[in-house]
Every structure is written in C-alpha cells, then in structure tokens.
Curated annotation (Swiss-Prot):
It is an enzyme of class 4 (lyase). Its EC number is 4.2.1.11. The keyword Magnesium applies. Binds a second Mg(2+) ion via substrate during catalysis. GO terms for biological process: glycolytic process. It catalyses: (2R)-2-phosphoglycerate = phosphoenolpyruvate + H2O. This is Enolase. It comes from Ralstonia pickettii (strain 12J). Keywords: Cytoplasm, Glycolysis, Lyase, Magnesium, Metal-binding, Secreted. It is found in: Cytoplasm; Secreted; Cell surface. (2R)-2-phosphoglycerate binds at residues 163, 337, 366-367, 388. One of its GO terms (molecular function) is phosphopyruvate hydratase activity. Mg(2+) binds at residues 242, 285, 312. Its main location: cytoplasm.
Length: 427
C-alpha cells in the first residue's frame, strides 16, 4: 500500500551555502522518498515564490524554517494517508491548500520538496527507477547536455555581460561519449586560461569566470579549447548562450557594460544575429528582457528558424505564459526549472504543452543546487532531449551527469542519443 504515513521537512544547505528545503516522505510499506530543492540567482519576476524567513539574525535572512514548518504542519495534515502514486491529485491538493497564484503562502520550495519526495517514494514502492516511473516504457532518449563552461553576468564577478557560454556535444553516439567530450573541452579550456595567466577559479555552476575583454574573445577561446581537445566546432560540438538579458536591461536599452554598448531591442537582436553568423551557436536563452515581448518577437522573426531561442525568465515554466508566447510566435523553446512552478504535475504540463506546439523543452538546474538528481530522471522520463546542468566540476553538477550515466547503462541497447536531432524545430 502506498499510503503516506509520515512527512518530515528540514532545513539543509545548497551549493552556495544558503539554506534550502529537504523533505522525506515515508509510506506504509516502509519505503521512503527524499528530495531537496534548488534556488536561483537570476530569477524571473513571475516565478513561483520561494519562501524565506527574512530573519537577518539567521543565515542573512535566507533561512527556510517557515517553509519547513509548513511541511511539518499544514501540508503533512493535508496529505497524510493519501496514495503516493496519485501524483496529480496530490499536487492539486498542495495547490489548493496554498490558495495563491504564485504559491507565496506555503512557499514553492516547501511544495516542490513534498511533490518530488512523494514521487520518489512512489517509484521506490513500485520497484521502478524514477525515470521509468515518470515516463513509462517510452522513456529511452538521453538528453544532449548544455555545459556551462564560462560564467559571466550574475553568476560571476567579471566583465562579461552574457551570463553563460556553453558547449553542446552533438556529434557523439551516446551520452557517455558526449560527457567525455565536454570534460575534455573543459580541461583543454582550463589549460588555455592558465597558459594566458587568466583565472581558473570556477563560478556557481562550475564554469570558469575569467576576465575576457569581450564576448567574442570568450567564444574564440572556447573554439580553441574544442579544437585542442580534438573535436570540430560546428560538427562534433555546437555552442549555446544564456544572455539573461533581463539582468542588463535598463530604461528600454540593453547595456553591455563590458563592451561599452547601449543597444535598442532591434540592435541587440542584430548583435545576437551577428554572433550566430560568426560562431556555431545553436541556442540562445533569454536573449531579450522578460517583458520585452516586441524585442522577443523581433529576435524570433530574425533567428527563430535556425537558432533555438529559449525562454527562461520569459516563460518561468508556466503554462499560462507559455500558451501566450506560443500564440504570439515568441521564442521556440522553453527552459524547464522545477522550482519556478513548484510541483511536478505543473512541470510535466509545461513540457507537454511545449512539445505539442513544436517547441523544444530544456530541463534545467539552478545556480544554487544540491546533490538531488531528480532533474536527470525528468529529462529521460519526458524524452526532453536536452538538459542544462552546469559545467564539468562541482559535485552538485556531477550528481546529475553521473545519474544520467547510470540511466543510460540501465537502458542498455534501447538508449538513444539525439545529437543534432534534439533541435527538431530548426532547419
């Protein structure tokens, strides 16, 4: 019987040393599910609300004891005795209990921890790996990783305005080989930076954060690392950017302070199109401010046929906003962050809506992570085809990559690696 008999919430620390929420869910049969939630640095204004205590005497106000208390009292009372295998009903119970549009009463961090822990307990009870529990017998596609090897913007203390410079190994026949490719490029880049006397310290997501003079210098250095690692850019490996443009949009202009530029939406769209012409860039995330829908439309009209344009702050894993974007022809892909929306059921609904509209879905970590690897199972369980979970260092990032290695091994001969076909909506 998969009835829930005990729920325990607790405060633990994330990869940045900030508190986050962990939850254990115990079932009548004795099996347990445990989940910990991540936390973002650059956040969309319409994300579900992460409940923090605001008590400056503890953890600089970032404690999560209120969220934990909600798990141990109200949430526990509401779902005790429910069947853990009824995920949609359970998540709806949490949503109704919270009663707000943005989960600000109970906290999306409290709700998500419970939602994930319940799913893990139910999978354990069913004797299934989590990815199989999520996706059934059709779950067999490994994701192409977006590997964030250079950090800028809000993730680093340097002069790069673009937040993430990523490599995507697409010319390999398996996830295992793709991971090796990414790791070899990471180490080649480290040597290049060290030889130039540049910093090889890593940022929140495990990428390097050196002081490049410009975005183009950074991209050219990454191309050199790809070549030195023995791979061909444009064939074996493609590039991806996360502009996080909301972070440098002020008074209607895009301020690239590192390059001394102030650009209109149209000029910034041209700037990105120029980069995409010069470099093998296949994906650009948050290329415009989350509220600059006219800019997004211009960017989509200009690049949407040949570059994956991913909405993160734009869509915040929210089906209402995604639906509007689809209707208006804005972007062609959605970034999926489980803590932006706060339950697994709503997360899966966003992935499904994107796929039906011919948009791609990229499953993503946050900059503040834990050892929890649920997103790896979500990526395979939904056959998403892409995952974004950091660079090739820091064990909070490796936890997801290593889980994907285990899943690929478990799948055996039926595992498929999509490579370039992950971008099924590009020409």
């Amino acid at each position: 019987m998969s009835a829930i008999v005990d729920i325990i919430g607790r405060e633990v620390l994330d990869s940045r040393g900030n508190p986050t929420v962990e939850c254990d869910v115990l079932l009548e049969s004795g099996v347990m599910g445990r989940a910990a939630v991540p936390s973002g640095a650059s956040t969309g204004s319409r994300e579900a609300i992460e409940l923090r205590d605001g008590d400056k005497s503890r953890y600089l106000g970032k404690g999560v004891l209120k969220a934990v208390e909600h798990i141990n009292t109200e949430i526990s009372e509401a779902i005790m005795g429910l069947d853990a295998s009824e995920q949609a009903f359970l998540d709806r119970t949490l949503i109704d209990l919270d009663g707000t549009e943005n989960k600000s009463r109970l906290g999306a961090n409290a709700m998500l921890a419970v939602s994930m822990a319940v799913a893990k307990a139910a999978a354990e009870e069913a004797g299934l790996p989590l990815y199989r529990y999520f996706g059934g017998s059709g779950a067999m596609q490994m994701p192409v990783p977006m590997m964030n090897i250079v950090n800028g913007g809000a993730h680093a203390n340097n002069s790069l305005d673009i937040q993430e410079f990523m490599v995507m190994p697409v010319g390999q026949s398996s996830f295992r080989e793709a991971l090796r490719c990414g790791a070899e490029i990471f180490h080649a880049l480290k040597k290049i930076l060290a030889d130039k006397g540049m910093s090889t310290a890593v940022g929140d997501e495990g990428g390097f954060a050196p002081n490049f003079a410009s975005n183009e210098e950074c991209l050219n250095t990454i191309l050199s690392a790809i070549e030195q690692a023995g791979y061909k850019a444009g064939e074996d490996v493609l590039l991806a950017l996360d502009c996080a443009a909301s972070e440098f949009y002020k008074d209607g202009k895009y301020h690239l302070e590192g390059e001394g530029l102030q650009l209109s939406s149209e000029d910034f769209a041209n700037y990105l199109a120029n980069l995409a012409d010069k470099f093998p860039i296949v994906s650009i995330e948050d290329g415009m401010h989350e509220s600059d829908w006219a800019g997004w439309k211009a960017l989509t009209d200009k690049l949407g046929k040949k570059v994956q344009l991913v909405g993160d702050d734009l869509f915040v894993t929210n089906t209402k906003i995604l639906k509007e974007g689809i209707e208006k022809g804005i972007a062609n892909s959605i970034l999926i962050k489980i803590n932006q929306i706060g339950t697994l059921t709503e997360t899966f609904a966003a992935i499904e809506m994107a796929k039906r509209a011919g948009y791609t879905a990229v499953i993503s970590h946050r900059s503040g992570e834990t050892e929890d690897s649920t997103i790896a199972d979500i990526a395979v369980g939904t056959n998403a085809g892409q995952i974004k979970t950091g660079s090739l260092s820091r064990s909070d990032r490796m936890a997801k990559y290593n889980q994907l290695l285990r899943i690929e091994e478990d799948l055996g001969d039926i595992a498929s690696y999509p490579g370039k076909s992950a971008f099924y909506n590009l020409r």
